[in-house]
């Protein structure tokens, strides 16, 4: 039997210097993906070394948004079938994408060997990185992956239409007892549209009424990165992987941050 307590302690030592800022971004609609692509590239161009774990498949991925090709998944590097450099998709100065759709699924219920190899891979990826982004893809029942759920901050990016907002609400309402007391919300496109703003206002009211979660409107990803940095002290860095493993073991999106 795997003893996850011992496993977490060992992996925590492997990843003691976890990246200072980890932000998950859930996008709903093609304009939302383009918003993330633009914000990630802007931050990297300004000097922030950024690593992206892209849990979204080929269609709707950041590589797709940048018109780039991805051959391998991070899981293949973790399993040592290919080198880590073969997985990396360079999307601009300081911006490296790692397709991770298969990796995200494999983390749920990961055995000891896979978890240890994942931690070792993370240790390599954190070298020189200022920001880790997780382009989150929720499951059909709107549950986040262990990696996405363990981030310091969650950003939900919506378009100004009912379909996008409804899907976003389906995810957010699952997080009522989750790790974030506040979730960042960005509107991609249609910022001046009265209808879009009305939808966003209604979303915020519904979320607050039914889950108690507060939605904070943001225009730039920088705001979320700064908020993530505020909780990225030494103790928090040591707990990051522990949270990933906790979610992996429970298959749950409601594991709260331990203080």
Please identify what each model-predicted range represents:
Residues 114-220:
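Conserved catalytic-core segment of NTP-binding enzymes
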Residues 1-23, 181-259:
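C-terminal lobe/tail of nucleotide-utilizing enzymes
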Residues 29, 74-75, 108-112, 132-135:
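Short, flexible loop segments at the rims of nucleotide/cofactor-binding pockets, characterized by
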Residues 3-15, 50, 55-100:
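Phosphate-binding loop that captures ATP/GTP phosphates
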Residues 89-126:
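Hydrophobic alpha-helical segments and helix pairs
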Residues 16, 41-44, 79, 89, ...:
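Signal for well-folded cores of large energy- and translation-related assemblies
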Residues 25-30, 53-58, 99-103, 135-138, ...:
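Structural motif
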Residues 6-58:
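Walker A (P-loop) phosphate-binding motif
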């Amino acid at each position: 039997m795997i003893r996850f307590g011992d496993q977490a302690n060992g992996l925590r030592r492997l990843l003691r210097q976890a990246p200072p800022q980890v932000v998950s971004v859930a996008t709903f609609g093609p304009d939302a993906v383009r918003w993330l692509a633009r914000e990630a590239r802007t931050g990297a161009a300004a000097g922030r070394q950024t690593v992206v774990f892209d849990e979204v498949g080929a269609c709707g991925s950041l590589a797709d948004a940048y018109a780039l090709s991805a051959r391998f998944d991070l899981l293949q590097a973790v399993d040592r079938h290919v080198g880590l450099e073969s997985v990396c998709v360079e999307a601009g100065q300081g911006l490296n994408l790692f397709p991770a759709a298969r990796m995200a699924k494999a983390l749920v219920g990961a055995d000891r060997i896979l978890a240890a190899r994942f931690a070792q891979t993370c240790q390599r990826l954190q070298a020189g990185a200022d920001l880790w982004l997780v382009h989150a893809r929720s499951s059909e029942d709107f549950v986040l992956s262990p990696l996405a759920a363990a981030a310091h901050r969650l950003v939900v990016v919506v378009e100004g239409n009912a379909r996008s907002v409804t899907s976003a609400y389906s995810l957010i309402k699952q997080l009522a007892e989750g790790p974030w007391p506040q979730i960042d919300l960005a509107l991609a496109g249609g910022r001046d549209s009265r209808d879009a703003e009305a939808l966003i206002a209604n979303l915020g009211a519904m979320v607050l009424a039914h889950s108690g979660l507060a939605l904070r409107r943001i225009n730039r990803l920088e705001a979320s990165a700064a908020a993530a940095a505020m909780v990225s002290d030494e103790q928090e860095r040591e707990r990051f992987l522990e949270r990933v493993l906790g979610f992996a073991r429970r298959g749950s999106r409601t594991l709260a941050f331990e203080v």
